[in-house]
Amino acid sequence: MEVELTNIQKATSSDYWSLASNQYPCGKFPKVSVGVTIPRTSSVSRGRDAASTAAFEKNLSQGTDGRSRPPKMDNASLQVSPEAANHGGSAKEVPKPVPAKVSVSQPDDNAIEQTGTFSFGTRREQDSHLDQLDRPPLVSSQGKRQVESADKNKPNSEMLRMKLWEILGGTSQNKEAVASPNPEDIETPCQPKSQIANGPSSGRQKVFTSPVPYNIKTPAQFNSQTANKPSSDPIESDSDSPQVVEVRPITRSLGRKKEPTGSTHQDKSGSAKKPLSTHRSTPKQKILDNVFAFNDKCTPKTVGKSANGESGSLRNLRSLSRRAKVEPKKAHCSDRISHKTTQDDMERKVPSKYIPSEKKGEKTNSFSSLSRTGKTAESCSRSPKRERRVNTMANVGARKMQLSENLLVKTLNDGEHKLSSPQLTSFKSKGKCSSISPQQKENDNTHIPEASDRTAARNSFNSTPSPAANPSPVLRKYSWEHDENPAINGKSGQKDASPLADRFSDMPDDFASPTFAANIKISPHRSKMLDDDLFSSKYPKGVNRSRSTSFTSDPESEPLDKMEKTNELPGSESPNSQEERQNRKQPHLSPLSPIESEGAQISIPSFRKGYKSHKWLSDVDSPDKSSIEHLGRKSHLKEGRKGKRQLTSPTHFATSGTQETMSDKEPEKVPENYLTRAFDQLVVVLGRFQTKIKSETRNKSSKILAATGEIIRQHLEGVEGQMQADVDKLVNAGKSKRKRLESTFEEQQEKLRILHEKFKEEVNQQLLGCKNSVEDFEAYHAELKGVADKQKASHKKLLQNAEKTVGAQLSDAETKIAEVQKRARKRMKGLKFVLKELIAETAE
């Protein structure tokens, strides 16, 4: 892979922003020259190198978003430190050239070149120099700057990233880099993962698989940004304030020994024309092919930067590495890249720069993923053809963009709008389909400028091109040439993604996906189909599209979800970042190979399935498309858990020629406000659950009371019947006896009357008889009274028994009701406890 320095210089309107320019001293990192090919020693452990490469690229993807990249300036691109290139936040904070500072703390160009182990224009041979470099010297400087950056970084975003990373299970592949006690590995979240190479001299060296350079700026952007030059090592913190500039430790080479400037310069000049060395065994190359690094906006980054140690790429790598250290699992799916470059596009993109003439086919296959993922602005800056293309795009980008869109519309209407299977697979794994909505096509066709530059650039860069995106090789010789012009690319990041970025920020129902962006040109029919499947009750409304985009690209950040939350506002990115994302955005428009087109068709159903499988709380609030992740984003959320978090380990791409297949384990990201929305939806769910519990409790209580009342009623009826029977019996017996007594008394009276006549004779006898009758009557009365008293006592006992029975029934009913209420309260307490834990986890 030869780096054509002259071509790069020609491609750029100014040598200042030509990162490949070799007119600057090699000893100064700020002055980056592309094309240094460092012979890579065979001692580099392939397994670890590949693993760390994958992890690093994923970390780079998560760590490098438009927010953290400094706007490039005419001289700033050559003068800025690597961190400044990556994290120079807004346009106001353009890195300032500090050659002395950089030369002291940074590794030499070779060490920096090492970071570009496999980037466009970078040779794998550079790993040997990397292996030979000593790591310790920069550790202290890194720690120092790390402390500085830590103060400026908002802990919330880092904590959220870490949380999401854990949820996503990001430690699986990047466990080595993450578990490393090294401050470079852990403390600097933006620090990219480095491949561990066992160099002959340093023993174990970290070879940074730096992301593809993305700080190329059009002359217009440079002119607008020339005045602002921040310190040599400014990086934008991940906090919500994009203006915060952090000076992170120069850990690009992770303490590698700085080689002499002369040797570095020689390496640069020598490697400029050398093809990429094929030392790497085929397995190693395959591993690298499968490795894709993406920034938070899913900007593909090849597992390597230019070996010539360009200051812009080094700075980007360092800032990215800081993030990557904390978020090793941030494997951002380069969906658009996976299918965006065919073999021919790869050969065109990397004609002599990456592929030796005798092994160009082999290099195309082995580095197809790299070339596809690495077609970022930074790599373009180092690639002479990319520089030339950038220059050309400034002039004819609008015309090509118009033609491309016209052809795209026609092709999409013809049914040729096939998304690549890797892209759809990544879509499925991430569940991010917001960019393929019908609005996306509108955004692609409208080219409306957007105030949110980073969002626009991110969306446009992250978009997945359909085969129609590349109307023809003639119309767009290079995949990134289709829509570049200074107005769209450099100044406002307005490209097709701008409307989509607006959509991301304005459309609450859809969760923006970095993998899908405005460049995806899908027919209304396909868009509607995807919208129906992908945007149904998936994510909560009000999701910040730019945040969600960068956030979804981070598997660790769901949420979510499953959830890295980029705290920077979409409009905060600098024009440089915009143009860089535009430049990176270009490669994904290369025509899809037939295989990729077929894969795209096949992948759509599975993508929908995977996308739906990542729903966290979709049933909670379907209108809001809740994914209380991601809530797995996060929910993640969804999701955040956020789960919620269907988020998985970083995506690997299986590269076959120019086709990469993204693994279904692509983590899902969640926007920062995802937690709030998740909480709101959880509150809604809690309210519904509470209402349901209360309703059930009332129903059960009513049933219990009704049953108890029926039992009591029946019992009382029985008691009443028994009492009535006893009373009736007593009354009947009394009446009969009374009747007999009355008859007897009447007879006695009658006799008395008779005897009255015989008064004297029989008066005593009759009086005695009456007296006896009266006595008998009194005795009966006493007896009757005694019987009545007995029955009264019996009835009293019956009433007492009935009362006891009724009380027991009522007590039983109350006990049952209390148990029901207790269970309801217990459930509510459990739900509240789970909710608190969820809120605590998501808040962390």
Swiss-Prot record:
InterPro entries, A to Z: ASY3-like, ASY3-like_CC
Composition skew (Low complexity), residue ranges: 459-473
Keywords: Chromosome, Coiled coil, Meiosis, Nucleus
Chief location: nucleus
Keyword rRNA processing belongs to the record: no
Disruption phenotype: Sterility in both male and female gametes.
One of the GO BP terms on file: homologous chromosome pairing at meiosis
Residue ranges of coiled coil: 731-765
Keyword Ligase (UniProt): no
Region (Disordered) residue spans: 41-389, 418-506, 532-604, 616-669
Ranges of Basic and acidic residues composition bias in the record: 122-134, 145-164, 256-270, 324-363, 441-456, 616-640
Subcellular localization(s) per the UniProt record: Chromosome; Nucleus
Tissue: Expressed in pollen mother cells and the ovule tissues during meiosis.
GO cellular component terms listed in the entry, alphabetical order: chromosome; nucleus
Bias (Polar residues): 106-120, 191-208, 218-229, 364-382, 420-440, 545-554, 646-661
Functional description taken from the UniProt entry: Plays a crucial role in homologous chromosome pairing and synapsis in meiosis. Does not seem required for cytokinesis. Is essential for meiotic bouquet formation, homologous chromosome pairing and normal recombination, and synaptonemal complex (SC) assembly. Required for the proper association of PAIR2 with chromosomes.
PANTHER family, A to Z: MEIOSIS-SPECIFIC PROTEIN ASY3
Protein name: Meiosis-specific protein PAIR3
Native source species: Oryza sativa subsp. japonica (Rice)
Lineage of source species: Eukaryota, Viridiplantae, Streptophyta, Embryophyta, Tracheophyta
